[in-house]
Amino acid sequence: MNRQKVIAIDGPGASGKGTVAARVAAALGYDYLDTGALYRLTALYAQKQGVGWHDEENVSELAKKLPAVFSGSRILLGGEDVSDGIRTEAIGMGASAVAQLPKVRAALLQRQRDFLTEKGLVADGRDTGSVVFPQAELKIFLTAESKIRAERRAKQIGIPCEGLAFERILSDIEARDEADRNRKVAPLKQQPDALLLDTSRLTIEETVKKVLDWYREV
């Protein structure tokens, strides 16, 4: 099978996968796919429709007809801008829940693959390198210490990196890590053919440069 013009980036929540992937895509002139957004959209859509996140049959049916549109940096669901709404920790937990459902993953698989064109693609999210794009030219497992990830998330939403609100963010991130590592379907783990990139002591710019350097070497 021929290699695919894809960079696949996996890793834990709040590790900066999306920011790094988007910047790498821009630098290369490739398209960008946030696969995690599709699961977040599915979780939000299910919530809006009154469907429980563990209801595999009904959630998978919603995933098949997900009325989502990616417009630049904005994400629309049924015509409503939900770019910020899908980024809450609660919806993140919902995304982790629906992503454990095999029928939901199957429903979204082809939709993810359809994003790949001759232009090239940078995709971030679980299973991007092992299942969605197994012949990707470069596969990366991007991670950082949980406290560092919590600090980055806190700065992103404008709260101090201390106090109860910060501790809640850290607790949520660690709980999600634990759930993702131990789930039966697509658990969080580095694949054998993926390069490990710990960004705990790296800036975004340094991380992007590292990814681009690796890609030029493949």
Swiss-Prot record:
<keyword id="KW-0547">Nucleotide-binding</keyword>
<dbReference type="GO" id="GO:0006220">
    <property type="term" value="P:pyrimidine nucleotide metabolic process"/>
</dbReference>
<dbReference type="InterPro" id="IPR027417">
    <property type="entry name" value="P-loop_NTPase"/>
</dbReference>
<keyword id="KW-0963">Cytoplasm</keyword>
<dbReference type="GO" id="GO:0004127">
    <property type="term" value="F:(d)CMP kinase activity"/>
</dbReference>
<dbReference type="InterPro" id="IPR011994">
    <property type="entry name" value="Cytidylate_kinase_dom"/>
</dbReference>
<keyword id="KW-0418">Kinase</keyword>
<dbReference type="GO" id="GO:0005524">
    <property type="term" value="F:ATP binding"/>
</dbReference>
<dbReference type="GO" id="GO:0015949">
    <property type="term" value="P:nucleobase-containing small molecule interconversion"/>
</dbReference>
<feature type="binding site">
    <location>
        <begin position="11"/>
        <end position="19"/>
    </location>
    <ligand>
        <name>ATP</name>
    </ligand>
</feature>
<dbReference type="GO" id="GO:0036431">
    <property type="term" value="F:dCMP kinase activity"/>
</dbReference>
<dbReference type="GO" id="GO:0005829">
    <property type="term" value="C:cytosol"/>
</dbReference>
<comment type="similarity">
    <text>Belongs to the cytidylate kinase family. Type 1 subfamily.</text>
</comment>
<protein>
    <recommendedName>
        <fullName>Cytidylate kinase</fullName>
        <ecNumber>2.7.4.25</ecNumber>
    </recommendedName>
</protein>
<dbReference type="Pfam" id="PF02224">
    <property type="entry name" value="Cytidylate_kin"/>
</dbReference>
<dbReference type="GO" id="GO:0036430">
    <property type="term" value="F:CMP kinase activity"/>
</dbReference>
<keyword id="KW-0067">ATP-binding</keyword>
<dbReference type="InterPro" id="IPR003136">
    <property type="entry name" value="Cytidylate_kin"/>
</dbReference>
<keyword id="KW-0808">Transferase</keyword>
